[in-house]
A protein has these predicted regions:
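Bacterial N-terminal signal peptides that target proteins for export
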Residues: 1-8
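Bacterial N-terminal signal peptides
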Residues: 8-16
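Intrinsically disordered, low-complexity terminal tails/loops enriched in metal-binding residues
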Residues: 16-177
Length: 177
């Protein structure tokens, strides 16, 4: 008798799980929920690899990517004004990438995003036509990317638009004057 109860329990459990799976897939928001979960998982991975590549916590800092008529800017700031450690780490990182990018070295963004970001091949090829200038900010720093070359500017904008999307900053992808 005990075996019959166990078998009944197992059958009811399995049929309930099968019904729940069908119900989830029939839910009109299921695909949206799955996409949101995937986006959150991707962001967590970007943050983890970013912390490794950049040397500071991605959750204690804020990234902004600005597009300008002559190029753009990468800005990183500490969320808390008194977070001096993050501010120093940001400044060190931005000084390093300004020099690395000028040399055509985009290893850190490639590590962070597990791919060669759009625009990098062209930025590497046109590296002598792009100026990378580090500027300190009160809570961090900025790398200003500027060029007179239309091809280099297009590559810089592609690169920054990718950063906006992958870091989920919400920054405008339209060039400002």
């Amino acid at each position: 008798m005990n075996t019959i109860y166990r078998l009944t329990f197992v059958l009811l459990t399995l049929s309930g799980l099968a019904y729940a799976q069908q119900s989830m897939e029939a839910c009109p928001l299921h695909a949206q929920h799955q996409a949101e979960k995937a986006k959150a998982a991707h962001q967590a991975e970007v943050n983890q690899r970013g912390a490794q590549a950049m040397g500071f916590s991605q959750t204690k800092t804020t990234h902004h990517f600005r597009l300008y008529a002559d190029g753009g800017a990468i800005e990183v700031t500490a969320k808390r004004a008194k977070d001096l450690a993050s501010r120093q780490q940001i400044r060190q990182h931005l000084q390093e990438i300004a020099q690395a990018f000028a040399n055509g070295d985009f290893a850190k963004p490639q590590h962070t995003h597990v791919q060669v970001p759009p625009g990098v091949a062209e930025m590497t090829q046109l590296k002598t036509e792009i100026a990378y200038r580090y500027e300190p900010l009160r809570r961090g720093g900025r790398v200003r990317l500027s060029t007179a070359s239309p091809d280099a500017r297009k590559a810089v904008h592609e690169f920054l638009r990718f950063q906006i999307t992958d870091h989920q900053t919400g920054d405008s992808d339209a060039a400002q004057p």
